[in-house]
Amino acid sequence: MDKGIRTGFQAALALAAATVGVMPGAAMAQAKPVTIRAVMHSGLRITDPIITTAYIARNHGYMIYDTLFATDANFKVQPQMVKEYSVSDDKLTYTFTLRDGLKFHDGAPVTSADCIASIHRWGKRDSMGQKLMEYTVSLDAVDDKTFTLKLKQPYGLVLTSLGKPSSNVPFIMPKRIAETPADKNVPEEIGSGPFRFVKGEFQPGLKVVYEKNPDYVPRSEAPSWAAGAKVVKVDRVEWLNIPDYQTAVNALINGEIDYIEQPPHDFLPILKAASGIQIVNYNTLGVSGMLRMNWLNPPFDNEKIRQAALLAVNQQDYLDAQIGDPDYMVPCLAMFVCNTPNATDAGAPKTDLARAKQLLKEGGYDGKPVVVMQPTDLAIAAPLGPVTAQALRKIGMNVDLQSMDWQTLVGRRAKQDPVDQGGWNIFHTFWVNADMLNPVSNVGINAKGRKGGFFGWAEDAEIETMRNAYALESDPAKQAAIAKAVQERAYAVGMYYPTGQFISPLAVSPKLTGILEAPAPVFWNIEKK
C-alpha cells in the first residue's frame, strides 16, 4: 500500500478507536470475534430511522430492529415478526398475532402495545404510513401477542405499508421508546433485531459497532430480500467512516477492511482488477436521483421559477457527472421507475434554456442567491450540486453552492427557516427504486406541505386527491392511469426532477460469502472465512 494511503487509513482507525481508549494495533491484536469491517456510504449520527429518510439510518434500523411484515424477492409481502394474521370478510379488520420468542435487547418481550406504539409513530412520518393512518379507525391490543387494525373503509395497501422495505421502514421499538415524539430522536437504540447496538463504542459520524443478538429467533423460511430468516454468522460488524475513497479502496484491496457500500464508479475498474475483490449488485432494482426544491423559500415558492429550473437542467449531464459508465446508468424521466407497471414519460420536461429564461422573468426572479447544498463526502451525490449550479447560472440565476458533509445536510434540510437564517433552496438525494414505484410510496410525490410532506414541503391538493384515489384502487390498469396523471401534475407544478437511474454495487473482500440481494445492505447470512 502507498505510504500516504496507509497513513491515512491508520489515522482513520486511530480516530475511530480513540474515544474508547484502544489504539488500532492493540484492538486488532486482541480481536478474537469474527468481525466484518465495513465502510458505509456515510457516517451514522442520527440513529432514529423514523425521523429521517436518510439511508444510513435505515441501514442501522435493519441491523437492530425487526418488522411485522417484510417484502420478499418476488415483491410479495410475507409475515416477519407476525406468526399469523386474518382479514375480516368486510375487509375492515386485520388481526395480527406475534411469533413466540420475540424479545427486545433489554430482555423485555415484544408485545402488542409495542407494535401499536411503533406503528403510530411511523405513521406520523412516513408517506405510506400517513396514508394508512388516514384510513385507520383504531389499533387495539387483544392480548399481549394479538392486536387489531380497524379501517374506515377497505384499503388495499395495509400489508404493503407494514411490509415497506425502505425509508421509512416500520421498525418495531419498545413502547416507551416509540412514544418519543415523532420529530425527536429516540433516546435509546433498543430493538429486537438480529444485531445489538454497542452504545459504549458508538462514535457519532466515525464508528458504529454491532454484535450478534444471541436471543434472536430467526424465521424458518430461507432469506429472500427483506423477508425470511435473518441468521447472523459473524460475531461483530463495525462500520468505519473513511471519507477518502482512495484510502478505503486501498484498505479493501489490502485486506484491512472487508466491505465498501458505495465505491465511486470511477474506482470500479481498479477494484475489478484487484485479486479476489467482488463487485456485488445487491440491489437489482437500482437507484434514482432527485433534485428537490424548497417550496417555502423564494424563489422556488413561485411555480414559474420551479418550472424554469426543470427546463434548465438535463438528466444526461447528471448521469455523466455522477456515474459516467453506461453499464451502470439508465436515463429515465419516469417518476415511478422505468420498466415498471407505472412507468411513463408523461409530462417530462425537455431542456429549453430560452423558455426557462422567459419563465424566470415572468416569475419575477430578483437575482438573490439560490442556496444549493452539496455533500462533498458522499461520492454518489457530490457531483450533482455543481451540475445544477451550472445549469441555473446559464439561465441567469445567482447560485450559492455550499459544501458540507452529508450528515450536516441531512440535519439542515429539515429546517424550514428562511435562507438567511440557515435555510436552503435546493438539495439532491437518491432513493432505492423500491421506494419510488407508486404515488403513495414515492415521498417526492407527497404533497402535504408542512403537514407531513417530505423536505421541500411541496403542497398540492390535486395531487393528494389523486394519491388517495391510487391508494383505494385495486385495478392495475386504473392505477397506472392515475400514476400517469399524478406524474403530469407533479412535473407541471415542479415537485422534483429525477436526475436518472443507476446501479450502485458493493465492493467486498474475497473472505465474505452469503451476501444477499435486499432493499438495503444487510449483514445477516454473511460469513467471513
List PLM regions with ranges.
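Surface-exposed binding/hinge segments that line
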Residues: 30-31, 97, 131-203
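Long beta-strand-rich cores associated with HINT superfamily self-processing modules
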Residues: 202, 506-529
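N-terminal lobe/hinge region of extracytoplasmic solute-binding protein
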Residues: 39-89, 120, 190
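Extracytoplasmic/peripheral linker and loop segments enriched in polar/acidic and small residues
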Residues: 400-411, 440-510
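Aromatic-rich, solvent-exposed beta-strand/loop patch
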Residues: 90, 105, 150-170, 190-244, ...
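Periplasmic-binding protein-like
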Residues: 48, 296, 300-339, 383-384, ...
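Aromatic- and charge-enriched surface segment that lines or borders ligand/interaction sites
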Residues: 83-128, 142, 146-150, 251, ...
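Structural transition elements
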Residues: 195, 326-362, 376-383
